[in-house]
């Protein structure tokens, strides 16, 4: 006999036997065209594409294969900078430079990690209905951006990098997230893609993507792979089996708030205390000084991966005083040892959940820039009884590489047909029953996509409504878990308690996003939600508005570029004429004095106008160039007709125009 669960108006009651239905959604053959793979990181992002049978990790306009996840607004016009340009001006414009959006995305403002981070950030984070919102100055105005909008700007940059390389528009992407990201964080990342004008065809877990990068060419039977992914802001561990192109995740664990930035912060706090002790001055009072220190500490940390000590030197750090201190590898390790050791607990948990022993692990794959830290490598090696981690993949690029391969699989690229990806959900999902008990429907580490159903009933006679409260987490009581959302099923016909049959179905899709349905089996009355977690999610109206804002920013960026190009053209043309008039071998030796004077005056006038019209629009700049050409061209043409230029062509538009460095 099937046991029925009793649903109260607020809570649900009883536990025990349930009917379970599990189905795997079939792969649909869809032709998307090119799908890029994006590793959207806390501190750096990376983009790749699978074409002609191989993955290409794409360099940005600075020639770098990883791009800082930074957005800044600078100058009187509030020009938007993204990537290297934004990070490079952090120390002179800290309040208007946004980074770490990944540490805010999908979280509540009151989240204790958000509150801890706010103390370290130079930009303002405001509370908007318990959602964090970043406030910066854009030109003369204060403007607020959600973490989704900031992440969207970084995604736009990655999209542009790919488009520049491919020479065509890109509309589809596979985007990676930490394996331990919850439902709200995954949804928010998908929303960021939508705002950026990208169709996110799949969200995949970062360690799984790295395993694809590592295991693509491994054809030697079944192997157990542990992926240890320690990046700039997040930490994941996943255990996978790889067997002839089939990648199956057995278990995953981690900390969505642990990474290289936390190591930097420890060193910064040490230096701030040291500086105060020596000089009596508090560096924290000067945001620029703190950001200068942050930049140099990050450099020092990188240096200590290959050196045993390094100097941290900053000219005029605070009140005109220079800063110079030595940082040894031993001190760096001492300051961070508890954080390094904390990475081993999730490793142990993943082994237990996979039902594997240390000796069963064939390969340890290190991913994320922070795995370059020698002490981290040493601790992992010791944990696995001296087993050396594999060094076959670039820790900065592996995740984007795997995402690009998955993009190739989905778009039907050649040579990807044998790759099958079986991922898991990181957290248990269930509903609240009477007494605040967490009744589990889908256990953690269940292979996704998956679908499970369970039958419940009413807790009171003639009860017309039941409320389904959905939670994720591992604790037995819902108060200790994370609420994803709730909804009502109404219109239940009058009946004694325990008689109505209400079937609740949980379905997790390929992106790890949950859809919940409740159906009254007697009437066929249904209600369903995709878990949106109203506290954390953006409404469709919000997303629409943000897409429009993003398009407006793209338009503004285009105007800034047009203005710069128009200024450059006028400047180049004017100075080219000035040089030619001053050169007796060129125009200077061929013009009579009156014509020479006319051109000189016109050129000086244009240069003077440029100096006093810094904010001139592209149209005004083009008009000035036209005026200058109107005065110069008749004289040069006359000279050319007379043969006085000695075969030399007139300095027409663009004759000396080059992009200036």
UniProtKB/Swiss-Prot annotation:
GO BP terms, alphabetized: chaperone cofactor-dependent protein refolding; endoplasmic reticulum unfolded protein response; ERAD pathway; IRE1-mediated unfolded protein response; protein refolding
Acidic residues composition-biased segments: 649-661
A GO cellular component annotation in the UniProt record: membrane
UniProt keyword ATP-binding, yes or no: yes
Matches recorded under Gene3D superfamilies: 1.20.1270.10, 3.30.420.40, Actin, Chain A, domain 4, Substrate Binding Domain Of DNAk, Chain A, domain 1
UniProt entry keywords in alphabetical sequence: ATP-binding, Endoplasmic reticulum, Nucleotide-binding, Signal, Stress response
Spans annotated as Disordered: 618-661
Annotated Basic and acidic residues bias: 619-630
Taxonomy, superkingdom: Eukaryota
InterPro entries referenced in this protein's UniProt entry, alphabetically: ATPase_NBD, BIP_NBD, Heat_shock_70_CS, HSP70_C_sf, HSP70_peptide-bd_sf, Hsp_70_fam
Signal sequence bounds: 1-17
Post-translational modification: AMPylated by fic-1.
Location in the cell: Endoplasmic reticulum lumen
Any Pfam family the entry gives: HSP70
Gene Ontology molecular function terms on file: ATP binding; ATP hydrolysis activity; ATP-dependent protein folding chaperone; heat shock protein binding; protein folding chaperone
Motif, Prevents secretion from ER: chain positions: 658-661
CDD domains xrefs: ASKHA_NBD_HSP70_BiP
Record-stated family: Belongs to the heat shock protein 70 family.
NCBIfam families: PRK00290.1
Its job: Probably plays a role in facilitating the assembly of multimeric protein complexes inside the ER.
Protein name listed in UniProt: Heat shock 70 kDa protein C
Source organism: Caenorhabditis briggsae
Lineage per the UniProt record: Eukaryota, Metazoa, Ecdysozoa, Nematoda, Chromadorea
Gene: hsp-3
């Amino acid at each position: 006999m099937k046991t029925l669960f009793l649903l109260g108006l607020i809570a649900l009651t009883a536990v025990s036997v349930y009917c379970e239905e599990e189905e795997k959604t079939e792969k649909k053959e869809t032709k998307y065209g090119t799908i890029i793979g994006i590793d959207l990181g806390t501190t750096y992002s990376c983009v790749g594409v699978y074409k002609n049978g191989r993955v290409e990790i794409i360099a940005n306009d600075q020639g770098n294969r990883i791009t800082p996840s930074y957005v800044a607004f600078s100058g009187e016009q509030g020009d938007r900078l993204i990537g290297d340009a934004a990070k490079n001006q952090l120390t002179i414009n800290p309040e208007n430079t946004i980074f770490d959006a990944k540490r805010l995305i999908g979280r509540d403002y009151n989240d204790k990690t958000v509150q801890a981070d706010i103390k370290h950030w130079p930009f303002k984070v405001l509370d908007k209905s318990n959602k964090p919102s970043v406030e910066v100055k854009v030109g003369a105005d204060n403007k607020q951006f959600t973490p989704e909008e900031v992440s969207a700007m970084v995604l736009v940059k990655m999209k542009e990098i790919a488009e520049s390389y491919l020479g065509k528009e890109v509309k589809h992407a596979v985007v990676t997230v930490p394996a331990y990201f919850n439902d709200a964080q995954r949804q928010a990342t998908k929303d960021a893609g939508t705002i950026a004008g990208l169709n996110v065809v799949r969200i995949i877990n970062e360690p799984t993507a790295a395993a694809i990068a590592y295991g693509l060419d491994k054809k030697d039977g079944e192997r157990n792979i542990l992926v240890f992914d320690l990046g700039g802001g997040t930490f994941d561990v996943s255990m996978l089996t790889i067997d002839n192109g089939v990648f199956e995740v057995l278990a995953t664990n981690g900390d969505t708030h642990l990474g290289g930035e936390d190591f930097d912060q420890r060193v910064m706090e040490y230096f701030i205390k040291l500086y105060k002790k020596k000089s009596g001055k508090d560096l924290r009072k000067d945001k620029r000084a703190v950001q200068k220190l942050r930049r140099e500490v990050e450099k020092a940390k990188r240096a200590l991966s290959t050196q045993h000590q390094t100097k941290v030197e900053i000219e005029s750090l605070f009140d005109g005083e220079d800063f110079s201190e030595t940082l040894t590898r031993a001190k760096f390790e001492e300051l961070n040892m508890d954080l390094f050791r904390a990475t081993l607990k999730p490793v142990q948990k993943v082994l237990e959940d996979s039902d594997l022993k240390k000796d069963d692990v064939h390969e340890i794959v290190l991913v994320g820039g922070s795995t370059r830290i020698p002490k981290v490598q040493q601790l992992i090696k010791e944990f696995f009884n001296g087993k050396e981690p594999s060094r076959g993949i670039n820790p900065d690029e592996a995740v984007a590489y795997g995402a690009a391969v998955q993009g190739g699989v989905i778009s039907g690229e050649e040579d990807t047909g044998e790759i099958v990806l079986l991922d898991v959900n990181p957290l248990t999902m269930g509903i609240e029953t009477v007494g605040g008990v967490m009744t589990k429907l889908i256990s953690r580490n269940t292979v996704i996509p998956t679908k499970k159903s369970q039958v419940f009933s009413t807790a009171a006679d003639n009860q017309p409504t039941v409320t389904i409260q959905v939670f994720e987490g591992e604790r037995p009581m819902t108060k200790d878990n994370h609420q994803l959302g709730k909804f009502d099923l109404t219109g239940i016909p009058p009946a004694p308690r325990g008689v109505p049959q209400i079937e609740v179905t949980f379905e997790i899709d390929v992106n790890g996003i949950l859809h919940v349905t409740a159906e009254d089996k007697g009437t066929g009355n249904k209600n369903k939600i995709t878990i949106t977690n109203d506290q954390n999610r953006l409404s469709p109206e919000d997303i629409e508005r943000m897409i429009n804002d993003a398009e407006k920013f793209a338009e503004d960026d285009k105007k800034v570029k047009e203005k710069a190009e128009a200024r450059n053209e006028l400047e180049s043309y004017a100075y080219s004429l000035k040089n030619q008039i001053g050169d007796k071998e060129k125009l200077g030796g061929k013009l009579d004095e009156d014509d020479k004077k006319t051109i000189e005056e016109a050129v000086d006038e244009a240069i003077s106008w440029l100096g006093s019209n810094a904010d001139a629009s592209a149209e005004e700049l083009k008009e000035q160039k036209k005026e200058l050409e109107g005065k110069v061209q008749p004289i040069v043409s006359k000279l050319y007709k007379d043969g006085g230029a000695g075969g030399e062509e007139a300095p027409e538009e663009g004759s000396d125009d080059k992009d200036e460095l």
